[in-house]
């Protein structure tokens, strides 16, 4: 919504049809500026079908890779199928999107790519083997792409959110992590998060707008932490 408020034209994609319908209703006032498309970034054909909806666009100014799935696992419980699904979605999917949009990004005067990481790209936690590995890989993909694409003036940066109120904030039992007593004790009462609260999507939106805009035209290969200071206390 913050990007649309900047008068941008947006292709908004999600693998979840229900989520797309909710977004379409929420963003109805921007109906002339946003196109919705179902997508599975593990599938090249699905990506092509989504991008066909904007084939009339002469160029693309920005790409935000925000797709991710979470799998609770560790070295004893993970299997290859679950591992591959997380890596393919959270890491390889971003590579596919970048490769598919590069031709039109090159035509932009100020092209930018943002990859959404996590604090877990930097700090390992229990039972998050595949997710943390994928996010760590996405960090290096961001830096490597910044080097590779600099010659085309394409900037590539990342945002690393902490505990943000999204669909992924709910546990398998349906409990919101911000409401868990363990979260309140460790992260709020004991100051693990210096700002003493969980974050919201609105807390993140300004960083996305900034990295897509000309205000960050000499910034590439960098990561902005949006975590209330959590990364300072690890």
Model-derived segments and their meaning:
Residues 209, 220-234:
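Short C-terminal tail/terminal secondary-structure segment
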Residues 98, 134, 142:
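Active-site helix of classical SDR
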Residues 118:
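Residue(s) in the substrate-gating loop at a strand-loop-helix junction
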Residues 1-11:
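Canonical Rossmann dinucleotide-binding motif of NAD(H)/NADP(H)-dependent dehydrogenases/reductases
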Residues 76, 123-129, 151-152, 196, ...:
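Active-site loop immediately N-terminal to the catalytic Tyr-X3-Lys motif
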Residues 74-75, 82-87, 189:
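Substrate-binding pocket helix/loop in short-chain dehydrogenase/reductase
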Residues 150, 155, 219-221:
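Short, small/polar-rich loop/turn modules that mediate ligand/substrate recognition or access, typified
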């Amino acid at each position: 919504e913050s990007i649309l408020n900047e008068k941008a034209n947006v292709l908004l994609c999600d693998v979840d049809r229900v989520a797309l319908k909710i977004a379409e209703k929420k963003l109805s006032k921007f109906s002339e500026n946003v196109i919705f498309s179902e997508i599975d970034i593990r599938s090249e054909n699905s990506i092509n079908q989504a991008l066909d909806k904007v084939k009339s666009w002469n160029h693309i100014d920005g790409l935000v890779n925000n797709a991710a799935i979470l799998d609770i696992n560790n070295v004893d419980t993970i299997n290859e199928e679950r591992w591959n699904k997380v890596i393919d979605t959270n890491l390889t999917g971003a590579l596919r999107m970048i490769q598919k949009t590069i031709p039109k990004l090159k035509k932009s005067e100020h092209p930018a790519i943002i990859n959404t990481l996590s604090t877990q790209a930097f700090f390992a936690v229990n039972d998050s083997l595949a997710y943390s590995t994928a996010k760590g890989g996405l960090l290096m993909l961001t830096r490597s792409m910044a080097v590779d694409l600099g010659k085309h003036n394409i900037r590539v940066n990342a945002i690393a959110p902490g505990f943000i109120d999204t669909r992924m904030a709910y546990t398998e039992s349906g409990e919101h992590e911000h409401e868990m007593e363990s979260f309140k004790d460790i992260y709020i009462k004991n100051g693990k998060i210096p700002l003493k609260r969980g974050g919201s999507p609105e807390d993140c939106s300004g960083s996305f707008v900034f990295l897509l805009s000309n205000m960050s035209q000499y910034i590439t290969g960098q990561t902005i932490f949006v975590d209330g200071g959590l990364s300072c206390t690890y």
